[in-house]
């Protein structure tokens, strides 16, 4: 049986791919960069306003690297522009496993906010947008909240963090980074450090620290940086 060929360029991608995507298949990493050309074409199509064409290129990129967040976010953007709410939700929920920074988690909650507004669930939508702001202030989230208020004809009620988290949990929406993903990033960091790949080890530790602010991880980063 032929091996799958994928374009993975970072140890974090290898760990995420092997855990979330590989299954029982075998794979090999392509020698050439088969991902970037599709991403560049997708961006060209976006600039031309061809969302269907852009989506096809993003989907081709997704086949080359299923864990690349820029690609998944590109697909989600096209789903929104093409009015495909169910597709947007499917890729948004998939993206949760690959959120490695606070900015990516913020995007995850904003994308869920869009979906729940499309499905006429304004309270859940508002909770998602409000929660996204805890991971990073965003003009986009503010604009979407303004749009939501106009759509329902009233102001979004102020809620504290526990109230927002309760709404999310009641709708089976996670309220923190995926602990499995954090563990995978930590393992990737350790393996990179053992292999004397300081830069990739630092990348992985910094992603974990960004999501957790764990003091022990902070010390490891300082130790590596001083070498």
Language model regions located:
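Register position in tetratricopeptide repeats
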Residues: 47-48, 81, 118-119, 150-151, ...
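Start-of-helix register in tetratricopeptide repeats
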Residues: 36, 70, 104-107, 140, ...
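Alpha-helical segment of the N-proximal tetratricopeptide repeat
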Residues: 30-64, 184-195, 200
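Short coil turns that delineate tetratricopeptide repeat
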Residues: 66, 100-103, 136-137, 179, ...
